[in-house]
Design a protein with these regions (language model features):
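Helix-to-loop junction immediately C-terminal to a conserved catalytic motif
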Residues: 3
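Conserved ABC ATPase "signature" region
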Residues: 18-19, 55, 59-83
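ABC ATPase NBD coupling module
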Residues: 20-36, 65-69, 179-183
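Short coil-to-helix segment of the ABC ATPase nucleotide-binding domain corresponding to the Q-loop/switch region
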Residues: 48-56
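Conserved signature/switch motifs of ABC ATPase nucleotide-binding domains
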Residues: 87-90, 108, 115
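Conserved ABC ATPase signature
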Residues: 88-92, 96-98
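ABC ATPase "signature
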Residues: 173-174, 182
Length: 285
């Protein structure tokens, strides 16, 4: 829908201040040229070398052969494949083929790069290298990158903002750290709350989610709380994350059954540099 190859049944699509549904055919074609796209499958032409694959969209646009090859070699340098210009796709690894696809998508100097599940077919090590490349492209070339993924780790690694979609509708929008710290929608909570056998948790118990960020992620907040408040708690789940280069951690605690002890624990957490809230629905998320 962002490229308007698929027209939405309702609503509008606005890209760079232009409402695509109101553009003429010629204007829409020009708008699409400002968008590059990579997919889960690399879709390289098998009978063309890496260099020739990158030149292909430039040839279609009427760019001279010399200028197209010059641009393609510049892009091969950017994606770290300057020594693979004459290799065919069958001679490249999956990660290298995706790098060629990225270079091809950048050939026309787009303002926006759309990444549709671009790392889903790659192993974890290659995924990290591709994400690092995309992050560098965003930083050095100033291109807006829109990532479509079901992997929260990808969002945490390279994105500044996130829109969570549930049943074809946007359930929540915000910066990645805002959504991680204070998820509001049920879908966001499913994605962000620590994994675990939630069904094994007793219903009717009180649970608290604590989020640590920055330096506070390294402080012994829970142990200090137990000592200070004399309120023992059970740590049900915990994990840590790196979101856009910043350390975050979260815990799900089972609060004491004694009401006064539970209130002391929550009051103490409010005085610390952490976000804490009761999550009565945690066991059922």
């Amino acid at each position: 829908c962002i490229t308007f190859l698929e027209k939405p049944a309702e609503g509008t699509v606005t890209v760079d201040g232009q409402e695509l549904g109101k553009l003429s055919k010629k204007q829409l074609l020009e708008a699409r040229r400002s968008m590059g796209m990579i997919f889960q499958q690399f879709n390289l032409l098998q009978q063309r070398t890496a260099l020739q694959n990158i030149c292909f969209p430039l040839e279609i646009a009427g760019t001279s052969k010399a200028d197209a090859e010059k641009r393609a070699r510049e892009l091969l340098e950017i994606v770290g494949l300057s020594d693979r210009a004459d290799n065919y796709p069958s001679q490249l690894s999956g990660g290298q083929q995706q790098r060629v696809a990225i270079a091809r998508a950048l050939a026309s100097n787009p303002k926006i790069l759309l990444c549709d599940e671009a790392t889903s077919a790659l192993d974890p090590t290659t995924t990290r290298s591709i994400l690092a490349l995309l992050k560098e492209i965003n930083k050095t070339l100033g291109i807006t990158i829109i990532v479509i993924t079901h992997e929260m780790a990808v969002i945490e690694e390279i994105c500044q903002r996130v829109a969570i979609i549930d049943s074809s509708r946007i359930a929540e929008v915000g910066t990645v750290d805002e959504v991680f710290t204070r998820p509001k929608s049920a879908m966001a909570k499913q994605l962000i709350y620590p994994d675990g056998k939630r069904n094994s948790l007793a219903t009717g118990k009180r649970y608290c989610r604590i989020v640590f960020d920055g330096n506070s992620s390294f402080e012994p907040v829970v142990s200090n709380m137990v000592l200070e408040c004399k309120a023992p708690v059970n740590i049900m789940f915990a994990d840590t994350k790196n979101i856009d280069g910043k350390a975050y951690g979260q815990m799900i605690l089972q609060l004491p059954e004694d009401e006064r002890a539970a209130k002391r624990a929550l009051a103490y957490l409010e005085t610390q540099n952490v976000h804490a809230e009761e999550v009565a629905d945690y066991a059922s998320v």
